[in-house]
Structures are given as structure tokens and as C-alpha cells.
A protein has these predicted regions:
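Extended substrate-binding grooves/exosites of carbohydrate-active enzymes
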Residues: 1-193, 197-214
Length: 215
């Protein structure tokens, strides 16, 4: 609306909340030709809680009122961190973001709005106790190249999942990582720089975590 009515055109910088899918449209329309993510992500997660199967979910609810720390769940209006980063990396006019949010806080327990006794948000990169969630290391690996980041999840010893395949995620600012279990290589992954904001926007790419493969 603010693009069409001219309000965004008179601002020094046009900011968009949870609208990366409108960035190109706004860039083509606005005279400033710079776009800021003034509120982004709202990925939800609970520190140390991992849900299976690992699938991208919107407004997913569980009986324990938690969200998966695999960092693949978000709100109906929001997205995952990589959805924003692709714009910043691929388009020089997408100048950055303010992530919602740094710390969990009391209130807005999305997606458990009406589910007693939920009362804490799940948006935070850091939890209510000030302890980093897995997502903290994802952001650090992307934002802070001066600090070595090599973070693996979930827990290494998963009682009750014997004989099952447990997905392993690694957040690192190294170009590649290799996973070893009991001294045996399980394979090596290299960041896929061929993934772009344009070739990863379809539903199949989203479901297959194509965007995550770049980071």
C-alpha cells in the first residue's frame, strides 16, 4: 500500500517488515532504489528442542508448546534467515535488516497465542535465560567473519532414536564441512554458491532447503 500511495517514495530509506517477496517490486517502483528490512525473520525455536521429521513449517504447533531448534519453523507472515540473506547478498540495493528478535521476551507466544500456559515468545536468537540458541551461531557464521564458527546440531547422543536417521545441521563460516561419526566420514558439504534468490523461490526449493545449502 505505501508503495502505491507514494508514502514510501518520500522516505530517505524505504523499510519493509516481513516482505522480502516485495523487494524487487519496490525497487522497481521507488526513486531511492534502496530497500531495508526494517523487521525481518521471526523464525521460531526453543533452545535444545528438536522435532522430527525436519521439515519447513509455518505456524506449526506441538503438544509441548515448543518449536524446533532446527531453525526451520516460522510464522504465517514471516520466514527463515536465509530468505533475507539471499536478497542482501545478491542485490546491492537490499542494504540490510533488523532481525526480530535478539532475545526472547514475555508476550507474543506465537504460534501458541491461546494455549495456556504459553507466555514467552520463541522469536529470539537468545532465550530468556540469556543462553544462545542454535540460531545464534547461524547468524554469527554469516555476520561475523572475524570469529571462527563451527556449530553442529542436534545433540550427539540421542536416546530413543537408535537405528533412525537423525538429520545433522552445521553452521559455519568455513566454505565446507565434513562430518565424522566414530572416525568414519559421513560426507562433506560445500556451500552452494549457485543458489540465488531467483532460482530458489519455488515451493519445491523451499521444502528441500535449497536456500540453506548456500549458507
Amino acid at each position: 500500500v505505501v508503495v502505491e500511495n507514494g508514502i514510501a517514495a518520500i522516505m530517505d530509506v524505504a523499510g519493509f517488515n516481513y516482505r522480502p517477496h516485495l523487494y524487487q517490486y519496490a525497487y522497481d517502483k521507488l526513486p531511492q532504489q534502496i530497500i531495508l528490512g526494517s523487521e525481518t525473520a521471526s523464525t521460531v525455536s526453543s533452545r535444545g528442542v528438536y522435532k522430527f521429521p525436519v521439515t519447513r513449517q509455518s505456524m506449526k504447533k506441538y503438544d509441548d508448546h515448543q518449536s524446533s531448534s532446527y531453525d526451520v519453523e516460522h510464522c504465517g507472515w514471516s520466514n527463515l534467515p536465509e530468505d533475507d540473506w539471499l536478497w542482501h547478498n545478491d542485490k546491492s540495493w537490499a542494504i540490510g535488516e533488523f532481525v526480530w528478535t535478539g532475545f526472547d521476551y514475555l508476550g507474543e507466544p506465537t504460534p501458541y497465542y491461546t494455549d495456556w500456559p504459553s507466555h514467552s515468545s520463541l522469536f529470539g536468537i537468545v532465550d530468556l535465560a540469556g543462553l544462545p540458541k542454535d540460531r545464534f551461531y547461524l547468524y554469527r557464521s554469516h555476520w561475523n567473519k572475524d570469529v571462527e564458527t563451527l556449530h553442529i546440531l542436534p545433540h550427539w547422543n540421542w536416546e530413543g532414536r537408535e537405528g533412525e536417521v537423525t538429520p545433522v545441521f552445521v553452521y559455519t563460516n568455513y566454505p565446507s564441512a565434513e562430518l565424522f561419526i566414530n572416525g568414519k566420514s559421513q560426507g562433506k558439504r560445500t556451500k552452494d554458491m549457485s543458489v540465488t534468490v531467483e532460482n530458489s523461490a519455488d515451493s519445491t526449493s523451499m521444502a528441500n532447503f535449497k536456500r540453506q545449502q548456500r549458507y
